[in-house]
Amino acid sequence: MENIETILRLAEDKILLVQNLKALQEYKVEFLGKNGIVTGELKKLGSLNEQERKEFGLKINKLKDKIQNIIKAKAEILEEQELNFKLAADKIDLTIPARRYKQGSIHPITQCSEELIQVFSQFGFTIENGPNIENDFYNFTALNFEDDHPARQMHDTFYLKSQENNKPLLLRTHTSTVQIRAMKNGKPPFRFIAPGRTYRSDSDMTHTPMFHQIEGLVMDKNINMGHLKYVITTFIKSFFENSNIELRFRPSFFPFTEPSSEVDIRMNKNDKWLEVLGCGMVHPNVLKNVGIDSSEYQGFAFGLGVERFAMLKYNIKDLRQFFEGDMRWLKHYNFGSFDIPNLAGGLTK
């Protein structure tokens, strides 16, 4: 009995003075391990009679439980101390400037495209899409291009080696191809825009081999040039956020519209006129090619270059800069990720 009390006091004295978990584990082995002090006391049971074994065994088990509880309590204290020490060591200094968070930005072409689309959404336009690789019918024939039209030549159009019905495929030169597909596959009335990439064999300060267009089509009964002028005028003033902007509809020629017009604008009276888009009433031959009766339905179409509008609105001088990937230029002209327009105005994609 005295030996058991001595062992308990010894365990308490040693364990209470422990400063770390490693030393605590060593004392646990010393007292409760296979060759520990308490285990040594258990070995004495073999020399005792049955009654003594029962009493002594009960005391040893109580000793073992008390030492385990002491160790457990000390372990909790040491673990809390170590956690507090670690937290103090890892403390964040809130006065230190934060690292700059790297994030993407919106390219001016994307920004301009979304702004243009948002404006057209106010007129109830929907979006139609089509393939970048087209055949001769959708890109030229259905749009009333003559067989010898210069636009069909290889110096203007990218032709592919692949063929369809013994005729070469090509990269579309305008998104008017989308209008043809939509009219052939649907029934009027129509009111949609067709944004997308287009391709022409040209490269200088104002032309690139690949560029972005948005073309639009409105078709219904009794549509006339007055509707066309209203939509274009309202669109231009809304996009450039200038109600005083001047527009000039200048007679022109396009195979797929008749009459045709090119639209010039100037921000102020003293500015030079700038050409921004082409438009006109859909040619009866185009309607015939897609199976629509031109005596019942009329429509107008328009087409604009996204890069051209971006250059005018954001004051960008050289078209080629859009595609050079100069990080300094992009840092200056790109838009924040949250600046992109909200398309909740009713547009459907």
Curated annotation (Swiss-Prot):
Enzyme class label: ligase
Assigned GO CC terms: cytoplasm
Localisation per UniProt entry: Cytoplasm
Binding site for Mg(2+): E258
Any Pfam family hit: Phe_tRNA-synt_N
MF term (GO), any: ATP binding
Cofactor note: Binds 2 magnesium ions per tetramer.
Catalytic reaction equation(s): tRNA(Phe) + L-phenylalanine + ATP = L-phenylalanyl-tRNA(Phe) + AMP + diphosphate + H(+)
Keywords of the record: Aminoacyl-tRNA synthetase, ATP-binding, Cytoplasm, Ligase, Magnesium, Metal-binding, Nucleotide-binding, Protein biosynthesis
Biological-process GO terms, alphabetical: phenylalanyl-tRNA aminoacylation
Cofactor(s) recorded in Swiss-Prot or TrEMBL: Mg(2+)
EC number: 6.1.1.20
Family assignment from sequence similarity: Belongs to the class-II aminoacyl-tRNA synthetase family. Phe-tRNA synthetase alpha subunit type 1 subfamily.
PANTHER family tied to this protein: PHENYLALANINE--TRNA LIGASE, MITOCHONDRIAL, PHENYLALANYL-TRNA SYNTHETASE
Cross-referenced HAMAP family: Phe_tRNA_synth_alpha1
Subunit (UniProt): Tetramer of two alpha and two beta subunits.
Entry protein name: Phenylalanine--tRNA ligase alpha subunit
Native species: Rickettsia africae (strain ESF-5)
Lineage: Bacteria, Pseudomonadati, Pseudomonadota, Alphaproteobacteria, Rickettsiales
